A protein has these predicted regions:
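Short, low-complexity, charge-dense intrinsically disordered segments
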Residues: 16-19
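Short, contiguous pre-domain boundary segments
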Residues: 52-67, 222
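Rieske [2Fe-2S] iron-sulfur-binding domain
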Residues: 29-33, 96-200, 206-214
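Non-catalytic accessory segments flanking enzyme active sites
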Residues: 65-109, 113
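General detector of N-terminal leader/presequence modules that precede the first folded domain
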Residues: 31-56, 368-371
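C-terminal catalytic domain of Rieske-type non-heme iron oxygenases
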Residues: 116, 122, 128, 188, ...
Length: 424
C-alpha cells in the first residue's frame, strides 16, 4: 500500500467533537497548516529527549515510548545509525539462497545490500554498489546470476565479490582490480536467518542472540521451509507494526470473530541476555491457531514438540526487525524495513516442516492458513494506521503498559530507549 501524498508541512488532524447528548458526534477530518509542530529540534542529542528514563524499569511502573519516536524525522535518522547500522539486523533466510549464484537484494538503513551464495557454498553480503561510479548492481528482489554485472558500464564481479571484468580500463595508470572488489558487509547465518551489521562494530552475533538457539531448539527453525510469502506496505511506523504482533492485549477487541479467544494468557517473557524477547502461551483448545475454527483443516504437529509446547505458540521478537510466531504446526515470520518514519515495508512468510510440505493435500490446507493470516493482518492494519494518526497528534503523551499482556512490548521499548538515549 502506498501512503497518500500531502504537501510538506501539512498533517492530518482528526478531531472528535463530544458533548453531553445521545446524538452521535461526527468525526471531522481536515487538512491544516501547522509549522514545525512535531519536529524534534535539529541536532538535538538523543540523550536529551524527554521521556527516555520513564520507559526503563519494571513493566508495572514503566511508561511507553515518547510519541515522537513514531513520527519524528530526527529520531528516525538517529535510528538508522543506532538501531539499524549499529546492530545485527535480519536480512532474509538462507533457504532462499540454496544454489550458487542465487541472491536477495534489499535495503537496510536506506543502504542497498545484496546477499549471494558463492561457488564455495558460503553466503556473503555486499554493498549493492558498483566500485566504478556507484551504480546499483542488482534490482531489489531475488534472482540467480553467474556473476554480478554492472548494468551501467559492464564491470563484473565474481560471486565472492572479486572484480573480474573492467572493459576499456587498460590505459588507467596504477589501477589494480584487487583494490576494487565489492565491499563486504559483516554477516552471519543463525538458525536459518541471515543477519547483517552495517558498521561492523556490533560485536558477536552470538552475543546478540545469546540464548536464542537453545530456547527455540524444539522448533528446529533452520529446517523449516517457506511455503508462502508476500510483501506489502503499511502506513505506520515500523515499531508499531512489530509491537502489535507481540502483545495479547488487543486480541479480544481487534480479533473478536477470528482468533481473539484462542489463546490463554501467556507466560512471562523468558529471562534472556540476548537482544530479543520471547513469550510462550498455551492455546485454549487443543489444536492449531493457524486456521480459522470453521476450517478444521490443520497440519500435523511439528516434530520435536512435546508437553506444553505441543499445544501453544511462542512469540519472539529479535531486535530490531524480525518477529515470528512458532506454533505447534507452523511458523509465521515477519521482517520489516522502515520506508520513512510513518511507513513500513513488511515481508511475511508462512513456514512449515519440509516433509509436511510434500504431503498429499498440502496445497489445499496451506490455503486455509493463508486465509487466517490474511484476515488477521487486515484487522491489525486498520488499527495500526489509525494508531499512527493518533500517536502523531500534538496531544499524544506517554502511556502505561498492561503488565500481563504487554511485557514483550515493554522489553523492546526498554532496549530501544537504552540504545537511543546512550551518550555517543
Amino acid at each position: 500500500m502506498v501512503g497518500r501524498y500531502r504537501p510538506s508541512g501539512y498533517v492530518l488532524v482528526s478531531i472528535l467533537l463530544i458533548r453531553g447528548s445521545k446524538k452521535r458526534c461526527p468525526d471531522l477530518k481536515k487538512e491544516v497548516k501547522i509549522e514545525n509542530l512535531f519536529a524534534t529540534p535539529r541536532g538535538l542529542a538523543m540523550s536529551t529527549v524527554a521521556g527516555w528514563d520513564k520507559v526503563k524499569g519494571p513493566v508495572e511502573t514503566a511508561y511507553t515510548l515518547p510519541p515522537s519516536c513514531y513520527f519524528s524525522p530526527d529520531i528516525y535518522t538517529s535510528e538508522r545509525k543506532r538501531i539499524f547500522s549499529g546492530g545485527w539486523v535480519s536480512f532474509g533466510r538462507a533457504e532462499d539462497l540454496g544454489n550458487a549464484g542465487e541472491y536477495f537484494a534489499s535495503t537496510v538503513s536506506d543502504t542497498p545490500l545484496v546477499a549471494v551464495r558463492g561457488d564455495d557454498g558460503e553466503i556473503r553480503v555486499f554493498a549493492n554498489t558498483c566500485r566504478h561510479r556507484g551504480m546499483q548492481l542488482l534490482s531489489e528482489g531475488r534472482g540467480c546470476v553467474r556473476q554480478i554485472a554492472c548494468p551501467f558500464h559492464g564491470w563484473g564481479y565474481a560471486l565472492d565479490g572479486a572484480l573480474t571484468a573492467t572493459p576499456r580500463m587498460k590505459s588507467s595508470i596504477d589501477f589494480n582490480k584487487s583494490d576494487f572488489g565489492l565491499i563486504q558487509i559483516s554477516s552471519a547465518v543463525r538458525e536459518g536467518f541471515i543477519f547483517v551489521n552495517l558498521d561492523g562494530a556490533a560485536g558477536s552475533v552470538d552475543d546478540w542472540l545469546s540464548g536464542f538457539s537453545d530456547l527455540h531448539q524444539p522448533w528446529n527453525l533452520e529446517a523449516l521451509r517457506t511455503a508462502s510469502q508476500r510483501e506489502f506496505r503499511v502506513r505506520c511506523n515500523w515499531k508499531l507494526f512489530l509491537e502489535v504482533f507481540n502483545e495479547y492485549y488487543h486480541l479480544k477487541k481487534v480479533h473478536p470473530g477470528t482468533f481473539g479467544s484462542l489463546y490463554r494468557d501467556p507466560d512471562p517473557p523468558e529471562p534472556v541476555t540476548g537482544c530479543f524477547v520471547s513469550q510462550f502461551g498455551e492455546h485454549v483448545k487443543k489444536g492449531s491457531v493457524g486456521v480459522l475454527e470453521k476450517d478444521h483443516n490443520e497440519l500435523p504437529l511439528l516434530p520435536g514438540l512435546t508437553g506444553r509446547l505441543s499445544n501453544g505458540t511462542r512469540y519472539s521478537w529479535v531486535y530490531p526487525n524480525l518477529s515470528f510466531a512458532a506454533s505447534r504446526d507452523a511458523l509465521w515470520m515477519l521482517e520489516v524495513t522502515p520506508i520513512d518514519p510513518t511507513e513500513t515495508q513488511v515481508r511475511m512468510r508462512l513456514m512449515f516442516d519440509a516433509d509436511v510440505m510434500q504431503s498429499r493435500g498440502f496445497a489445499a490446507k496451506l490455503a486455509t492458513y493463508e486465509e487466517r493470516m490474511k484476515i488477521g493482518m487486515a484487522e491489525d492494519i486498520v488499527v495500526l494506521e489509525a494508531q499512527q494518526i493518533g500517536v502523531s497528534s500534538q496531544f499524544a503523551r506517554q502511556g502505561r503498559f498492561c503488565p500481563e499482556l504487554e511485557p514483550s512490548v515493554h522489553a523492546f521499548q526498554e532496549w530501544y530507549a537504552e540504545r537511543m538515549s546512550a551518550v555517543s
